[in-house]
Amino acid sequence: MKTHRPARVGELIKREVSDMLLRGQIKDPRVGAGLVSVTDVEVTGDLRQAKIFVSIFGTPEAQKLTMMALAEVTGFVRQEIGHRIRLRYTPEIAFVQDRSLERGARITRLIDEIRAEEEARAAHKEEGN
């Protein structure tokens, strides 16, 4: 029987970590180097581990600093999750950088470039007739 509990717990963790980031409860100044948002949380079936996917808007250097800071505050974040969500075991957490938005923007840019090239070719072809 498949349970939906990991997904529900993931949504709770996502909400709480987002709240911590929004309210500035994570005191490390490097976390503020880039604009951070929680995009997804994957929790294992036994609820013992959670991957927190974050999207970071900023320079590559700011993204790197932010990921280093998040790696260092995992203990604090886990402790806060334990206080905020009633679970038998608080999951071990790991922050993972979500690059799907960057990939999506890159694909959109490539499509726009191809479309512009095709329009230029079509215009050049019409001039030739």
From Swiss-Prot:
GO MF term set: ribosomal small subunit binding
Biological process terms in GO annotation: maturation of SSU-rRNA; ribosome biogenesis
One of the record's GO cellular component terms: cytosol
Compartments, as annotated in UniProt: Cytoplasm
Keyword flag ATP-binding: no
Keywords: Cytoplasm, Ribosome biogenesis
Transmembrane recorded as keyword: no
Job description of the protein: One of several proteins that assist in the late maturation steps of the functional core of the 30S ribosomal subunit. Associates with free 30S ribosomal subunits (but not with 30S subunits that are part of 70S ribosomes or polysomes). Required for efficient processing of 16S rRNA. May interact with the 5'-terminal helix region of 16S rRNA.
Family annotation (HAMAP family): RbfA
Oligomeric and partner information: Monomer. Binds 30S ribosomal subunits, but not 50S ribosomal subunits or 70S ribosomes.
This protein's name: Ribosome-binding factor A
Organism the protein comes from: Gloeobacter violaceus (strain ATCC 29082 / PCC 7421)
Upper taxonomic lineage: Bacteria, Bacillati, Cyanobacteriota, Cyanophyceae, Gloeobacterales
Name of encoding gene: rbfA
